[in-house]
Amino acid sequence: MTLQVCIMTPDRIFWNDQADEIILPTNTGQMGVLTNHAPLITALDIGVTLIRSNSNWNPVALMGGFALVKQNQVTILVNEAESAQTIGVDEAEIAFQEAKTKLEQSQGEKQRVEATFVFKRARARYQVVKQLGV
């Protein structure tokens, strides 16, 4: 038995396929979902979700949203989603280093919050390309 995973963004269905397992970046940490998981709704943080199908792990950068798990269906609504194939490795690494530097140099609460948001997005994109080994 498998999970039916659907990742939707405001402008398209990003992923709609079967999976054996999915690991979600929730606001309280990573959460794994296997078949026959208890029903739940959870908020998703900016981060990497890992989708396992046929012994292959597919990393996807998610930019915050919600997930609904019910009857072996995982429906994910996110602001944005990216796969390693659409992210440039060099661009992702440069953006990550720049975001890290800006976060370290941020002063004041507003600047720190904005820098943290940019850092999380850049880190998720960088982790996706590094995980796939592109």
Swiss-Prot record:
Species for this entry: Chlorella vulgaris
Membrane topology (UniProt): Peripheral membrane protein
Described purpose of this protein according to its UniProt entry: Produces ATP from ADP in the presence of a proton gradient across the membrane.
Localization: Plastid, Chloroplast thylakoid membrane
Main location: plastid
Keyword Metal-binding tagged: no
Family of the protein in this entry: Belongs to the ATPase epsilon chain family.
GO molecular function, one term: ATP binding
Pfam families with a match to the protein in the record: ATP-synt_DE, ATP-synt_DE_N
A single GO cellular-component term on record: chloroplast thylakoid membrane
Presence of the UniProt keyword Transport in the record: yes
Oligomer status and interactors: F-type ATPases have 2 components, CF(1) - the catalytic core - and CF(0) - the membrane proton channel. CF(1) has five subunits: alpha(3), beta(3), gamma(1), delta(1), epsilon(1). CF(0) has three main subunits: a, b and c.
Name this protein carries in UniProt: ATP synthase epsilon chain, chloroplastic
Annotated NCBIfam families: ATP_synt_epsi (TIGR01216)
Record's keyword terms, sorted: ATP synthesis, CF(1), Chloroplast, Hydrogen ion transport, Ion transport, Membrane, Plastid, Thylakoid, Transport
